[in-house]
């Protein structure tokens, strides 16, 4: 009688057969989906290695199979590694869309993207890069000597396909490491250069120039890269590229455009074009939703727009400037946007009658007719504007904030402190300090008597054990710090006086007389 197979092993066999209905039936009976064969492969890994089992991959993922299950060994890894190695683009898209981690490395320290590049699967490379890249698009690179740029700059640039990729998943505890990957063409699977941006010095482009560029200096190889937008003067694309180099993902999709001298792709590869489109991650979508919600709440509360709105007049710069009067302390020229109109500003005239002071007794109709007759009048858009928000001011200073007289410091109390030391036999205190009219004439005996009668201070105890009375003194500093047992212990360990940390040459016992 043979051994009965488990339900998990039956699921593995149904995957090899491509029987999706059988897999669902076994799963309904409680069968697991993570059975491992003798080679370490799970059912999802087996289905990810065959192009005809794309429907089985879909069923296993829907039933709860672990897309990041790891298979140890050389040229192994997760199901995404196996699909990328086989060049199965649809399977790669399916795994990535259901939470497969593209940053997991196998035992050879290779990611799924590395395996796809090594095997030459261009479509899989573009699919993975389109999912995780911060920027991908055509750029121009200067490859000639720097002194020739002034003579023939158009002949010293070449088109490249630039992709900015993170090396690992986003982690809030450490900065994100980015790589700039340069391909000579879109159909190339292996990059021409890989630049580690966290080891490079990035120069910000000067957008005031006609044709700005981004300069990247690799400190490790001492190589300088100068990149320009594919269209001369396209500052928007250069801004996207520079922001991606700084770690800011781009929401705008960078659809790759074929260069003029590139061969036409095959129809099969053209169908994979949407895979190159950069899609924002879940964190970016949540951040965009939060920003939009804050903007809508600000509009609903009537917060005025802080961006200045310049108005143009027909006076050929001979009219009054649109700046506020009294060096910026006058009333604003534009009113706050209304709730119903969103961010539509209400444009008013930059100058008014009598420099902001209207003649009393004139109505609004008379003033409007005067403005219509003037040449530098502007059209006023009727909007329901909210009253201007009060400008916060600093609180007034109190009268006694500043003092002109001399500074009065507190007086120093010169009264001596009473110090009481009990005797070793438990008797009365024998030494103290007594305040007297003339401190130099005070006698020790009188001080001891006063100290024994005063109950202001507790009897002296050992500062180390806080239990025994003070019995010894440290020589040469003379501090009466503690009992003999504690002081002997400190002397044997050569720790020094517990009060002043001075070196102890001798410990003497004190006797009360």
Curated annotation (Swiss-Prot):
The gene is XBOS34. Disulfide bonds: none annotated. This is Probable E3 ubiquitin-protein ligase XBOS34. Residues 309-378, 423-455 are annotated as: Disordered. Keywords: ANK repeat, Metal-binding, Repeat, Transferase, Ubl conjugation pathway, Zinc, Zinc-finger. Residues 361-378 have a biased composition (Low complexity). GO terms for biological process: protein ubiquitination. Pfam families: Ank, Ank_2, zf-C3HC4_3.
């Amino acid at each position: 009688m043979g051994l009965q197979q488990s339900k998990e092993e039956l699921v593995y066999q149904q995957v090899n057969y491509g029987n999706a209905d059988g897999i669902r039936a076994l799963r309904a009976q409680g069968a697991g989906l993570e059975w491992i064969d003798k080679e370490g492969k799970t059912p999802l890994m087996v289905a990810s290695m065959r192009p005809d089992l794309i429907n089985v991959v879909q069923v296993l993922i829907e039933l709860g199979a672990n897309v990041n299950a790891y298979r140890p060994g050389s040229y192994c890894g997760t199901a995404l590694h196996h699909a990328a190695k086989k060049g199965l683009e649809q399977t790669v898209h399916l795994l990535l869309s259901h939470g497969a981690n593209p940053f997991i490395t196998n035992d050879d320290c290779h990611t799924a993207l590395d395996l796809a590049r090594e095997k030459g699967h261009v479509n899989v490379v573009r699919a993975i890069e389109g999912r995780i890249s911060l920027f991908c698009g055509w750029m121009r690179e200067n490859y000639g000597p720097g002194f020739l740029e002034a003579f023939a700059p158009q002949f010293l640039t070449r088109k490249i396909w630039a992709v900015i990729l993170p090396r690992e998943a986003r982690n809030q505890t450490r900065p994100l490491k980015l790589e700039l990957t340069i391909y000579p063409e879109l159909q190339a699977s292996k990059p021409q250069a890989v630049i580690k941006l966290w080891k490079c010095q990035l120069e910000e482009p000067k957008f005031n120039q006609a044709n700005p560029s981004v300069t990247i200096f690799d400190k490790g190889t001492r190589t300088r890269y100068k990149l320009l937008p594919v269209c001369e003067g396209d500052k928007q694309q250069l801004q996207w590229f520079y922001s991606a180099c700084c770690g800011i993902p781009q929401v705008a999709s960078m659809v790759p455009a074929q260069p003029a001298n590139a061969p036409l792709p095959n129809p099969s590869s053209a169908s994979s074009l949407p895979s190159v489109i950069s899609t924002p991650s879940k964190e970016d979508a949540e951040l965009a939703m939060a920003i939009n919600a804050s903007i809508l709440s600000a509009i609903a509360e009537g917060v005025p727009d802080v961006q200045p709105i310049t108005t143009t007049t027909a006076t050929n710069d001979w009219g009054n400037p649109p700046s506020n009067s009294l060096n910026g302390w006058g009333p604003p020229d534009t009113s706050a946007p209304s709730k119903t109109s969103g961010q539509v500003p209400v444009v008013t005239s930059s100058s008014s009658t009598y420099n902001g002071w209207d003649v009393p007794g004139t109505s609004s109709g008379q003033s409007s007719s005067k403005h219509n007759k003037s040449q530098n009048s502007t059209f006023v858009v009727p909007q329901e504007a909210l009253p201007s928000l009060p400008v916060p001011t600093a609180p007034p200073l109190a009268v006694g904030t500043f003092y002109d007289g001399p500074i009065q410091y507190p007086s120093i109390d010169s009264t001596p402190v009473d110090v009481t030391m009990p005797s070793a036999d438990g008797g009365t205190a024998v030494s103290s300090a007594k305040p007297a009219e003339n401190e130099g004439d005070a006698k020790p005996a009188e001080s001891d008597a006063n100290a024994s009668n005063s109950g202001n201070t507790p009897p002296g105890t050992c500062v180390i054990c806080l239990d025994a009375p003070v019995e010894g003194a440290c020589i040469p500093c003379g501090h009466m710090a503690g009992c003999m047992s504690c002081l002997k212990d400190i002397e044997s360990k050569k720790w020094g006086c517990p009060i002043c940390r001075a070196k102890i040459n001798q410990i003497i016992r004190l006797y009360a007389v």
